[in-house]
């Protein structure tokens, strides 16, 4: 969805979102004589996944200046599971159980000013991301072994930026600089 509202000449708000739900299952009714299909059936896990992204952009117009505030959040949840020979009757047959989440939150502010033939933009951003993973995997080699790991990671980042652009009156020359 996308909703854009102009409250007045100076104030504008846009809100948008996108989401998906995936529930993938194995087609166990395939031809048992088809080796390539049986290989895939025995190799691929069942996957459940859901994702969404939500965001909002507020703009304030003031003559040659525009202030913009952007706030967004993205989320992905993923779950994979696999049983040996697709036999779910016992946990002894479990070969893979993976659950993970990825979450990102973003905030950005910028001010854009048009001064003659120059375009000046400055601002800052603050982001926080989380990654979680809990995995169990049973590997069958010469000696069967179990692999287990768990991750819970949070990352904070921030930044500032400034850019300046110039475009000649006849549009034959342009230049920009920023950091």
Q: Language-model features: where?
A:
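Acidic/polar loop-and-plug regions of large Gram-negative outer-membrane beta-barrel proteins
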Residues: 16-45
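Face-selective signature of the C-terminal outer-membrane beta-barrel domain
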Residues: 5-22, 45-179
């Amino acid at each position: 969805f996308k909703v854009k509202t102009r409250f007045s000449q100076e104030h504008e708000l846009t809100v948008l979102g996108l989401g998906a739900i995936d529930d993938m299952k194995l087609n166990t009714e395939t031809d048992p004589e088809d080796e390539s299909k049986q290989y895939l059936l025995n190799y691929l896990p069942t996957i459940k996944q859901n994702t969404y992204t939500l965001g909002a952009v507020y703009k304030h117009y003031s003559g040659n200046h525009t202030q913009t505030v952007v706030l967004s959040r993205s989320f992905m949840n993923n779950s994979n599971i696999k049983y040996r020979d697709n036999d779910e009757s016992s946990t002894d047959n479990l070969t893979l159980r993976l659950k993970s989440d990825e979450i990102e939150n973003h905030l950005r502010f910028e001010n854009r000013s048009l001064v003659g033939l120059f375009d000046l933009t400055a601002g800052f951003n603050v982001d926080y991301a989380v990654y979680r993973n809990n995995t169990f995997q049973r590997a069958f080699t010469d000696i069967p072994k179990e692999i287990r790991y768990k991750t819970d990671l949070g990352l904070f980042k921030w930044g500032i930026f400034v850019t300046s652009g110039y475009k000649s009156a006849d549009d034959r020359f342009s230049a920009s600089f920023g950091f």
